[in-house]
Amino acid sequence: MPAPTPHIPHSAGTSLVSCAELQALLTQIFLRHGTSAEVAAVLAANCASAQRDGAESHGIFRIPGYLSTLASGWVNGQAVPQVQDVAPGYVVVDACNGFAQPALQAARGLLIDKARRNGIALLAIRNSHHFAALWPDVEPFAREGLVALAFVNSMACVVPTGGHKALFGTNPIAFAAPRTGGDPLVFDLATSAIAHGDVQIAARAGHTLPEGYGVDRHGQPTCDPAAILDGGALLPFGGLHSSYKGSALSTMIELIAGPLIGDLTSLESGAFDGGANLVRHGHDLLGHVQQDVDFLGVGVALGHALHHAPHPARPFA
């Protein structure tokens, strides 16, 4: 999902690097902290692409989290995913307590083949760790001509509508669809009001958040990101009066990415503790090949309409 490179002012002592250079540097960092070459390459590509596309909360900001989980032994950086060909339209991968992205990489070819043969296929990843951007998981499928939809649950850090205790993860959804003559249509969004990483960035910078984003440890609304991180929780997306929408979608993802595939819910995995012990969770990815209608043509038309929908004074980036 490439975005135009913004102009970034820099001073003496700093320098700009290309995405390829950043990816190579990150690969070396992961290798030095004990991952296999395969795992290092996949994680570096994910972080570099997020940084390139402007998602700072999921780019190099995530590196300390990756390294702390490796140093503590909580995640196995040498894990070799076990791919199971379960049924004509179903693939299961045991990530073996490794990161989810290498597990997806190991099963991608089989999932694409099944989707093309059967029109649709589902991939379930169990026993994995995933706290990166989700769109890099789905975009490659769209570039192969498939429609892809992914769900993942995470650490319990979101209060359901009307509740007072963190029950859900940020539980993102990612979608990608091919377009003739252009980049795929891709989105990746949390079902919380804001990504957890963005709260961490706001706290570091001393910024406040808009109303309706979180609560403190007493369940009271707060705009202070530090209070949210210090025993508080995020709220579902939807705003002060419609957060039930985000809460409902998050419930769905808990079930789809948890017990439906034999894995844990966010609550079962344990709440985020601010340290290296990030939770294990499940990850679902659905690939679909549409052969009965001019899907690509419709996608081009819709993409064109979306691009020209904003007011000229507020264009898309």
PLM regions: where:
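Catalytic-core signal marking the mid-to-C-terminal active-site face
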Residues: P2-P9, G13-S18, L22-L25, L255, ...
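Flexible, glycine/charged-enriched surface loops at secondary-structure junctions
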Residues: T35-V42, S57-I60, G262-A276, G297, ...
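A generic, well-ordered mixed alpha/beta core segment in the N-terminal half of proteins
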Residues: Y90-T180
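Alpha-helix boundary/capping motif
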Residues: V289-F295, A305-P312
